[in-house]
Amino acid sequence: MKTDRLLINASPETCTKGDAEMDTMDTIDRMTSVKVLAEGKVLSNFEEPGLMRCGYHDAKNWVRRLSSETIVGEDTSNLYPFYVDTAYDVRRLRKDLINAKVDLQVENLIIICNINDISTVFLMREVVEWILRNFHSITVYVQDIFKKSTQFAVGDLCKDSNCSKNRVKYWSKEFVKKHDSFFDLMITLGGDGTVLFASSIFTKDVPPIVPFALGSLGFLTNFEFQNFKETLKHILTDEVRINLRMRLQCKLYRRNKPEIDAATGRKICYIDFISEHHVLNEVTIDRGPAPCLSLLELYGNDSLMTKVQGDGLIVATPTGSTAYSLSAGGSLISPSVNAIAVTPICPHTLSFRPIILPDSMELKVRVDMNSRGTSWVNFDGKDRVELKQGDYVVITASPYSVPTIESSASEFFESISKNLNWNDREEQKPFAHILSPKNQEKYRLDSSKNGNDTISNPLESSCISSDAQDEERKSVTETETEIVVERTRQAHFAI
């Protein structure tokens, strides 16, 4: 196991970072904080890809001139307008990126399926055969466990597709780690868990994902397998929108027991770097099998935010806001928003509400030295590790996002409406619908005499046209505006 040792002060209250970690954190901070500003500088040249790298360095220089690195004696009196313009351009550029369409040039395509269900092998075979028949320039990669699979039967598959066996190749986890930017497109067959697995094997660059839904409940799988031919034909021949789903970069550190320095007589301790993970949903720190509450310290940019006493803490991405965080009372967040959701698990206080933090913030969750028990951390529900007193996890926004092909511009709201019945409520009905036919006729006659506008059938009163509702809202809005203007005038004259 690869470890980086950090020499720190042994005080239980303050264990500061060593030089080795500070170098790493400076690199991460520069990537996360400068990246957005750098992209904003090239907005005017957005349609000229050759100028992108030049614009990055231009914006980076502006950030440095606005920071403490400003050269002594340089005139900085007019730098603030550039700062404001850059921030404005960032917002405009982000909007353009969300609405932009990408033309994918696919040569190497990887397919990942849920190997726990044998039926997915036959479904994958259908997809591979269709691609080989219709797109002769694409090489398909399937998992290496299907080399000798009788269900997949690569020899018969190539024979039926009338193509060479060289067009069907195999991938392994080791191959993906060495060639993470090799693939142009990824197809997943399964549920959300299959997408999470695909994200976990790509530690850096992830190819655009086409997630086909085969599970019972899915927030990430918005494409129906029944329409895979039409879907893939559109993606491989036309321009598509891509949603860059944020991931979290998690670094795990372990505090060793203090030692006595023979030269100075002072107590020192070492911090070992244990592992690094990139999660798409969440990182969870909980009390595990311990019978006592967990006691965690939550730091934001090296400042203590709060101490958490409860069953644990969830740090989630917007994609993970519909998973464990939602079950613990966290808010729903659109995946197009770059943010970090912090949700407590059964906190032993009434005032600890979930909070949403900017993605530029560096979080650190540390097991308090006075904690009665240990805690456990897991990353997207896997790789569970015990955290002892003084151990901590550093969490930042990962520079490597997970791109997924959008099925529609409103796919997020469609998924939460379909899977969670979000804001699904039966509309109010008029009381007249329970009247007998005889009394309904009397009701209509009585309403007509009083000059009320009625509908021939009271049951239809809840089905007023949308145009009429829009006119009514417009009238109410204009009336409210007039009242506000009149009150403003009165207040002005009163002054």
Curated annotation (Swiss-Prot):
Q: Where is the composition biased (Polar residues)?
A: 448-467
Keyword Nucleotide-binding set for record: yes
Molecular function in Gene Ontology: ATP binding; NAD+ kinase activity; NADH kinase activity
**Residue ranges, annotated region (Disordered):** 442-480
Cofactors, names only? Mg(2+); Mn(2+); Co(2+); Ca(2+)
Ubl conjugation among the record's keywords?
no
Instruction: Show the InterPro entries listed in the entry.
Output: ATP-NAD_kinase_N, ATP-NAD_kinase_PpnK-typ_C, NAD/diacylglycerol_kinase_sf, NADK
Q: Which Gene3D superfamilies did the record assign? A: Probable inorganic polyphosphate/atp-NAD kinase, domain 1 (3.40.50.10330), Probable inorganic polyphosphate/atp-NAD kinase, domain 2 (2.60.200.30)
Q: How does activity depend on temperature?
A: Optimum temperature is 45 degrees Celsius.
Q: How does activity depend on pH?
A: Optimum pH is 8.5.
Q: What class of enzyme is it?
A: transferase
What's a BP term from Gene Ontology annotated to this protein?
A: NAD metabolic process
Keywords in alphabetical order: ATP-binding, Calcium, Cobalt, Kinase, Magnesium, Manganese, NAD, NADP, Nucleotide-binding, Transferase
Q: Which reaction does it catalyse?
A: NADH + ATP = ADP + NADPH + H(+)
Provide the E.C. number(s) assigned to this enzyme: 2.7.1.86
HAMAP family noted in UniProt: NAD_kinase
**Family the entry assigns:** Belongs to the NAD kinase family.
Q: How does it assemble?
A: Homooctamer.
Any further remarks? Answer: Present with 300 molecules/cell in log phase SD medium.
Role of this protein: ATP-NADH kinase with a low phosphorylation activity of both NADH and NAD(+) to produce NADP and NADPH by using ATP. UTR1 is responsible for essentially all of the NAD/NADH kinase activity resident in the cytoplasm, whereas POS5 is responsible for all mitochondrial NAD/NADH kinase activity and consequent mitochondrial genome maintenance. YEF1 can substitute for UTR1 when overexpressed.
Q: What is this protein called?
A: ATP-NADH kinase YEF1
Which organism is the protein's source? Saccharomyces cerevisiae (strain ATCC 204508 / S288c) (Baker's yeast)
Question: What is the phylogenetic placement of the source species in the record?
Answer: Eukaryota, Fungi, Dikarya, Ascomycota, Saccharomycotina
Gene behind the chain:
YEF1
